[in-house]
Amino acid sequence: MPWWKCSNCGYVFEAEKPPERCPNCGEKCTFYDVSCYTPECGFKGYDPKLVARTPNQESKM
């Protein structure tokens, strides 16, 4: 199952597809697929490198 990161609050969660609203902040956001697809993170869970690289609103403040 894919992992997603909210563009607003940075929340990372597992779901078949991104929801309409973030389960953490409740906002309508863009969701980035941060699933692990490489050997470095074992092809499972989320990729910490992708989580660190994807922007979110809170990191811009």
Swiss-Prot record:
Stretches assigned to the Rubredoxin-like domain: 1-46
Superkingdom of the source species: Archaea
Pfam family, one: RUBY_RBDX
SUPFAM superfamilies in UniProt: Rubredoxin-like (SSF57802)
InterPro entries, per database record: Rubredoxin-like_dom (IPR024934), RUBY_RBDX (IPR048574)
GO molecular function: iron ion binding
Protein name from the UniProt record: Uncharacterized protein MJ0737
